[in-house]
Every structure is written in structure tokens, then in C-alpha cells.
């Protein structure tokens, strides 16, 4: 969702009702940890466990148009905020290609971006084990954010 907010912040998705709706929803920066970015890559990752037909019929078919319409890779623009992405190579839930694709889309748009793919750590490690490899993402983010004067 962070990638979507960072790329679709200017989309009208509801009728404005209050003054606050006039404020920009653009975040100052984006952190994506092991993100699902692309519909096609989501299908590909799911095929590790289920046939493609099952995934489409039971999980994604009703959302297909929305998922394709709001693909952060396709919506990346120079107006989006700087992007910090991290992932593990052994993540069995999301493919590293999601992270790589979003990083490349941000770069192509001329947006400051940084990508880290750790060799191992799986999926869902959150803030990670400070003693493990994945725990390094927090300090890497701080260093990156300082280099851009975000913090």
C-alpha cells in the first residue's frame, strides 16, 4: 500500500466532502519492505503454491482491473516521493522482482531510490532481528534518509 499511495496520491477515488480532502495525500518518502507491486508478479508468486487458474478464479479475478489500473510500476512519476525498498532473495511469498521493478520504475522517473536485497530472511520479518542480516535495513534507511535530508 505504501507504493500505491506514493504513486496514486493524486488520484480522485472518492467525492471530496471536507476541507482536509483538499490537502495532498503525497507522503514525504516511501519505505517498501518485501512489497507486492505488480498483478502479474503476484500471480507468478502464487503459482508456487496454487495453479494460476485457481488464483485468478478465487482470489484475484474480481480485482484484476483495479490491480492493473493502480500498478505502482506503471504510475511511477517524477512527482512521487523518494523510495527505499528492501527484500530478501529467499522470500517465498513475494518475488524480489516486485522490489526490483518498483525500484527501476522510480529510477526511470528520476526519483531518488535505494534497493536492498538480502540473501536470506524470508518474508514478514518487519523490523527484523537486530543481530541478523535483515535487521540492517533500519540503519540503511536512516543513512539513506539523512543523505536526502529527509531526517
Regions found by a protein language model. Name each.
Residues 79, 84-87, 91:
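Short beta-strand/loop motif that positions the catalytic acidic residue
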Amino acid at each position: 500500500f505504501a507504493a500505491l499511495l506514493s504513486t496514486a496520491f493524486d488520484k480522485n477515488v472518492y467525492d471530496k466532502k471536507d476541507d482536509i480532502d483538499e490537502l495532498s495525500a503525497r507522503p514525504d518518502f516511501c519505505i517498501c519492505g518485501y512489497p507486492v507491486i505488480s498483478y502479474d508478479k503476484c500471480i507468478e508468486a502464487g503459482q508456487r503454491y496454487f495453479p494460476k487458474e485457481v488464483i485468478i478464479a478465487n482470489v484475484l479475478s474480481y480485482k484484476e482491473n483495479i490491480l492493473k489500473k493502480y500498478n505502482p510500476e506503471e504510475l511511477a512519476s517524477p512527482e512521487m516521493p523518494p523510495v527505499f525498498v528492501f527484500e530478501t532473495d529467499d522470500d517465498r511469498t513475494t518475488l524480489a522482482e516486485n522490489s526490483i521493478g518498483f525500484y527501476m520504475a522510480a529510477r526511470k522517473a528520476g526519483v531518488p531510490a535505494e534497493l536492498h536485497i538480502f540473501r536470506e530472511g524470508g518474508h514478514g520479518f518487519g523490523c527484523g532481528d537486530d543481530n541478523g542480516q535483515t535487521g540492517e535495513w533500519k540503519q540503511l534507511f536512516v543513512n539513506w534518509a539523512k543523505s536526502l535530508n529527509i531526517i
